[in-house]
Amino acid sequence: MDKKYSIGLDIGTNSVGWAVITDEYKVPSKKFKVLGNTDRHSIKKNLIGALLFDSGETAEATRLKRTARRRYTRRKNRICYLQEIFSNEMAKVDDSFFHRLEESFLVEEDKKHERHPIFGNIVDEVAYHEKYPTIYHLRKKLVDSTDKADLRLIYLALAHMIKFRGHFLIEGDLNPDNSDVDKLFIQLVQTYNQLFEENPINASGVDAKAILSARLSKSRRLENLIAQLPGEKKNGLFGNLIALSLGLTPNFKSNFDLAEDAKLQLSKDTYDDDLDNLLAQIGDQYADLFLAAKNLSDAILLSDILRVNTEITKAPLSASMIKRYDEHHQDLTLLKALVRQQLPEKYKEIFFDQSKNGYAGYIDGGASQEEFYKFIKPILEKMDGTEELLVKLNREDLLRKQRTFDNGSIPHQIHLGELHAILRRQEDFYPFLKDNREKIEKILTFRIPYYVGPLARGNSRFAWMTRKSEETITPWNFEEVVDKGASAQSFIERMTNFDKNLPNEKVLPKHSLLYEYFTVYNELTKVKYVTEGMRKPAFLSGEQKKAIVDLLFKTNRKVTVKQLKEDYFKKIECFDSVEISGVEDRFNASLGTYHDLLKIIKDKDFLDNEENEDILEDIVLTLTLFEDREMIEERLKTYAHLFDDKVMKQLKRRRYTGWGRLSRKLINGIRDKQSGKTILDFLKSDGFANRNFMQLIHDDSLTFKEDIQKAQVSGQGDSLHEHIANLAGSPAIKKGILQTVKVVDELVKVMGRHKPENIVIEMARENQTTQKGQKNSRERMKRIEEGIKELGSQILKEHPVENTQLQNEKLYLYYLQNGRDMYVDQELDINRLSDYDVDHIVPQSFLKDDSIDNKVLTRSDKNRGKSDNVPSEEVVKKMKNYWRQLLNAKLITQRKFDNLTKAERGGLSELDKAGFIKRQLVETRQITKHVAQILDSRMNTKYDENDKLIREVKVITLKSKLVSDFRKDFQFYKVREINNYHHAHDAYLNAVVGTALIKKYPKLESEFVYGDYKVYDVRKMIAKSEQEIGKATAKYFFYSNIMNFFKTEITLANGEIRKRPLIETNGETGEIVWDKGRDFATVRKVLSMPQVNIVKKTEVQTGGFSKESILPKRNSDKLIARKKDWDPKKYGGFDSPTVAYSVLVVAKVEKGKSKKLKSVKELLGITIMERSSFEKNPIDFLEAKGYKEVKKDLIIKLPKYSLFELENGRKRMLASAGELQKGNELALPSKYVNFLYLASHYEKLKGSPEDNEQKQLFVEQHKHYLDEIIEQISEFSKRVILADANLDKVLSAYNKHRDKPIREQAENIIHLFTLTNLGAPAAFKYFDTTIDRKRYTSTKEVLDATLIHQSITGLYETRIDLSQLGGD
């Protein structure tokens, strides 16, 4: 096979379609040798097919489990540290106490010690539970009592606090004594009145606590309080102080007549510095006023959590929980009495039936608080005397449990306060507590810094920590054992992504000064100006660009076109009028970091000095990577000699986020060999060319392109895996790339190891309009402006926003939701976005959809109460009207609205969940770029004498739109549901269209061939347009016209019809490109070929050992133990172990009472848990399973999807050791495919009326095709599916609905292919008939079938007749 050929590829995350074509667009066929023990020694195959595989999955689920395991381990370690401190003293009191606690979960017969865990006897145990119904009763008693307590009780209380220690979101101290809102409000008023004696505030009669702690938005609370104070305004000084206390961001500029804004926000890291700046301007006499506002803020925050008076108790949290317990008891007593009196018939159902969502189901069953409230509310509404209970229910405060989702809101400082109080009380009686007080408190407060990471020893791929010594790490020796600096450096290296252009170089931080200079110059380089006396617009010179950066960008955070005209061209160049092009109203790029650092360092010369570039870059890197102030301080110490304490303090508080896409080496490191200039040098000054970044790296006259290509060359073999692993992209993308490369390698081998002329890859990417900008921020802004205007909201006036800020997801969602919570009818606070949760409407457990369409912004506590499905019906009822308003204003899409309201329609169905899997295919868009680069570097490895790459193989990348249009224009329609041939057909059509285009328009190689970027003006080759249009837009029009040479006639915009020749040639060489008579017939023939090589990749299963649900104890040998030595019959366990692969075993087993040995041949599933012991010694493993005289050489490993052939070509794939799947593909002639497509798209056909009429006429004239298609399905089903009952149902339903419209019949027939499709059987609907799946739950028939081992393309195969194995 020495003819020229090309390869077409259609790449997805679940499939790779492939085809080989000749110069005449034919698919060659070839005879292949068949290995094995069958009579078949050769087979003729067409070189077209598709590889199917299970898509690669992210490590997210594994990571979540790993982090949960770490969390539980660390919690257990905390308890061990506490027990260690208590052990000696506890041994004197009760030496088996810790042993009894350790055994408390075990059933009685497994316990080695007394069964009563606390006191070891029933009398004391009962007395304890009567005295302390909850752990919080014990905690409060110990905090408030001065009496000596039993050491065991002290341990229990401390252990509870250390085990459930609260969150670490609030830094520093949090004083529970500051929780008296009224008292601290009066203190604020008094402090204010001392300063402003002439205009005092009269706050008598104001119920500050009720107003400031109300469950309303902060702004509403502010308004309500100011309304109680005559003469005060919400933006006056006192109003702004209250706003500050509430967590808002007031501006004190007008209060103190300042020249600049003076905004303060307590939750900001920079609050202390911002306050210092303000006090420096207004005087220190106001310091106490701001301190009083801060104390009031702490009180408001805590009052939301703690609902008891801290003067009565030093245990506010425990007291609040006891109050909750007591109220629960009182409300339950009342509820029981009311039900007994008024609805006695309901009493049993509510209080005893755990299967219902009543009180019994709520306490002992699985009913959530929300479900219980939904159940009990109508019952309460029917009865008299329930008013108070209903008020509590509506406030979500009725019959609350001790452990609820909002316990997550308790800061660790509250637990620490109670722990400290207990130690203080009891250390007089137990001196060891005094000696170890700091150690015990450290157990509660210690957290491993995130930049140190997991504390694993050895070669864990997840850990990067560096040790100073090999000691065991504890909270008390952490600083001595762990090298925090070295660990932080490793953290940096792990966290930073690689530059896609130079794969070994790390990208710069987004706020790097160098990166910002690069973006500014890259934008300036395409700016043109024209003024009087100039014939045409000119680019800016190098001197002009430098002057503009110094004059405008270094003095303004944002630079506008108006400033460019007025402050530069008018004042410096003295142009009275000038027109600017290449930039809209303002520049996107800015020197934001320069301005930040200038404000802090206040030394312009230092910032402008190039010798300080490394220092400044390192500072920005530190401020981007680390949140931990201690580590920032440690890393910035290096520069302490350069800056004073004030500057260091301000630098430490500065935070940056985000990463750029390019490395320092790419921007300002690699140099053009001839000129010695870097890319940044060219952007600053490039003569008349004024090339931007993309032009510079693709210009053949410069050496950047060559340097980048060399850096990207991927090797062969093992390094291929490594190279693909290092690419940016999801695991699904990477798996698709690896399979594609393997397919291409095998096809080159099949073709005699000489390389193809072309490899054509479908590149799915949407057209973009350059003028609109590649960023979507402007489109986001436009969407918000139009939607908010439609709603009539004032939100954009109250909180203006710039389009670049809308890249922040939470901020974008805030505006899309008009500043309101999506699940509860409450306002959200724009200043507290970090406290809120972004929630997935369809949970990630069902669909990893991270689009804005699947996200809402909601308060954390409400979000936690939501079920693991779509938002509940109760939420839908409350919020649907509001969601409809957002839908009407186009702030949410119809899809988002449908998902939000799905609970009305029964929540997520199995069909939905199946659809979610298909939707993941969106990831295919980035995949082909990576494949093109890898294939190009693997195929083209030779260089000429000038060290220029010789491109032997052209890797052509196609937009999916081209082939899609080709199919529709020439009626090569695709119906995906029929079979998997469409992957192969797409690959074939990619090859046809790609090679024809290159033949017809060789000058356009730069548009299609990877790595070829010759400078041809695309716009000259398309229909001329009067106006100048952007390049991406030009591409779109170009692509819509480029396909015209395939047509026999084209219709121009004015309606004129032009004929085209039947034989298209290349204008310069005269070579025939497309013979319309011959080549369309060839394409039609290929698309009708019945023999297409469809291969399902066999895969050994990995992952979890079994299903995760813990099943209750029962007498079953099938349950897997939860822990070692835990009998599932006592403790329950897991079921459904995951089978890694199956094995064919030929051996003997004992049968009957006489235990006579009998020969067997059977499949055995090897679970993931068993895999290592099986592979270590297969014979020992199988003998332990009861097999004797195992024939080792006949053991065959059979991964999932192993293929077997039975009678009449019927095929089955292995699903597991006990189940099979369908293994054949129904090859439907293309005339039927076209008919089904047209019939099912009857009312949606796009095209001219005449064209559509013709298609509809074709459908009407070929109604009889319906019968023929059903006949094909029926014959195929009888031969290979063997589901007679299902087929009878289908034929009966078909005859019943024969008179239905053709479109309806065609749509339903398309559903029928679920019956015939390759793979796992599935249920489907045919009209109103549900056809259940026919499962193949026995694997016995394949034991004597032919096992087919296929290569990745399916062209090479080995056939093993299993019936010939294992005879006596």
UniProtKB/Swiss-Prot annotation:
The cofactor(s) it depends on are: Mg(2+)
Map out region (RuvC-II) in residue numbers.
718-765
- Region annotated RuvC-I sits at 1-62
The outcome of changing residue 165 to A is: Moderately decreased DNA cleavage
| Region (RuvC-III) residue spans | 925-1102
Outline what the protein does: CRISPR (clustered regularly interspaced short palindromic repeat) is an adaptive immune system that provides protection against mobile genetic elements (viruses, transposable elements and conjugative plasmids). CRISPR clusters contain spacers, sequences complementary to antecedent mobile elements, and target invading nucleic acids. CRISPR clusters are transcribed and processed into CRISPR RNA (crRNA). In type II CRISPR systems correct processing of pre-crRNA requires a trans-encoded small RNA (tracrRNA), endogenous ribonuclease 3 (rnc) and this protein.
The name this protein carries in UniProt is CRISPR-associated endonuclease Cas9/Csn1
Q: Which organism is it from?
A: Streptococcus pyogenes serotype M1
Q: What is the lineage of its organism?
A: Bacteria, Bacillati, Bacillota, Bacilli, Lactobacillales
